[in-house]
Amino acid sequence: MILASFLSEWVKLKRKTLLLSTFLGLAAASALFVVLIFSNAPAHGTGGGLPSLQQLARPNGLVFGLTRATFLLGVVAFGTAAAQTASEYSLGTLRQLLVRQPRRATLLAGKMIAVVTFMMLATAFAAVVAFLVANAMAQSRGVSTSAWFTGAGLGDLFNALGNIELAVIGYSILGLVIGQFLRSAVAAVIVGFAWLLVIEQFILTRIVPGAAPWLPGISLSTIAGGGNADFGITYGHGLIVAVSYLVVAIAAASITFARRDVTA
């Protein structure tokens, strides 16, 4: 059953070293983004692309810090997911899992759902910490928070958090797939980070400047931001492109996993 595979994967995910480092690391990074935004926000206008204190007092001011940290959350989700999948091969534990659960599609589905759930919970925890820090920083900078807790403010909050969680799901699935193909945690993380941090930017600046709407990393960041004004990409377009990539990736990983020999 998928539930058994899900619970089996959680035995590994809930180890203190992984759980604490992921949850606390994401929370600290998100809190840092919030502190930097509030500390450097000018009273009026914009400063280096940062929102002003007046903008932070608007209904969507509570989510500024977390949305700026989305790419970091996605990169961590990708790396964690890739490492969890690839390590099954490098440590030789996959063969033991297949003895207990020979239905490979069921095993893969349970593992994917478990890792995605883990990263969603880590992101939610980071969001809670970021929101608490945002309230504290608002008080220190004299920013009114009354608009944050209006109907519009709470709507913006849940909408932003939902978009960020969707993006994290996408990053996690791509990490799982890359880890499945490469079977090496180090190689999977390096390849994924290189694509997200370097290769996509190289494609845009050196090869195909107009390719932004069709790249997976930018599509996921578009979802997280509710659209991408820099490249003129709508939320709907980013969602369609990202889902298309994920469907193809999951199908390819499923076929490969079902047919690949496991000798260790």
Spans of model-derived segments:
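Aromatic- and glycine-rich beta-strand/loop motifs that create alpha-glucan
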Residues: 1-28, 183
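Membrane-helix interface segments
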Residues: 17-19, 103-105, 109, 184-186
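Transmembrane helix boundary and interhelical loop/hinge segments in multi-pass membrane proteins
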Residues: 78-105
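Junction motif at the cytosolic side of a transmembrane helix
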Residues: 241-264
